[in-house]
Amino acid sequence: VVIVSGYFDPLHVGHLEYFQMASQLGDKLLVIVNNDEQAKLKKGESFMNEKDRMEIIYALECVDEVLISCDTDASVCKSLELVIQFKPMADLIFAKGGDRNFGEVPEVDVCEKFGIQMVDSLGEKIRSSSEYTGLKQI
């Protein structure tokens, strides 16, 4: 199972390419969508609410499962631990997009603790969602 995460607020072609590349790394693709509270921490408000982002992503052909993050900070550490509880026998891969590498994400410790394989810099950053919305990171 390949796991990816992000705000996807709004979803754009760079995200779609990220999902497609990640889905090729394993049998199933699970997308963790950062929740509305996390979006407020990042940008002060979200462009699209978590439910709408989740529904759009779930409709994509390359996506098998979608989970709204249960975390209260900017990470998805608790959400990854939740996935481990529900998929204890699965070989898990946590893949980050081209705009992130594991030197700058807090999920590294959880991945190392539970033996989750990590793949970073998947694809390249084409455009920021903030360019579409006008909302800037705070």
Question: Where are the regions that the model predicts?
Answer:
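Nucleotidyltransferase catalytic core that binds NTPs
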Residues: 1-138
